[in-house]
Amino acid sequence: MFAPHSIVCLYLGNLMAGADTSSPLIESRADLIEAMERGCKPEAEWRIGTEHEKHVFHTNPLRPVAYEGENGIRALLAGIEKKTGWHPFYDGENPIGLRNDEVAGGISLEPGGQFELSGAPMADVHGTASELEEHMRVARKVAAPLDIHFLGLGVTPLW
């Protein structure tokens, strides 16, 4: 049997995820298994996707990249948009990412200043590897003249 707070957490989690509030309350292990099984896809529809965050920085002087300016994040996004044809999305007037509408992938600027590839759903890890390789090839090509570099690190460096 689940502890009462576990049931509340599952219920609140469903609410936050936009689930129908008339869904039956999960009160037992069997209820939980049944709910999870309803959400499963057939194996033929299984996909894998990439989430790849990297810090963006300049080397001279060593510092994070500002949003504005001729060598900033906005310029990086504009250059990648031009190379890929992906569509920008905005926070107010400011582009904060690009969407690839053909395959449901994109690039976004994260709150800590990281640059993130949210990959398209792929049939296997080889597809994600190819997608990441192409993303980095384009990003580096656009970034090089801007003196922008990338660092895949799980914590923010001390600049």
Question: Model-derived features: where do they sit?
Answer:
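Terminal catalytic/cofactor-binding subdomain
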Residues: 13-159
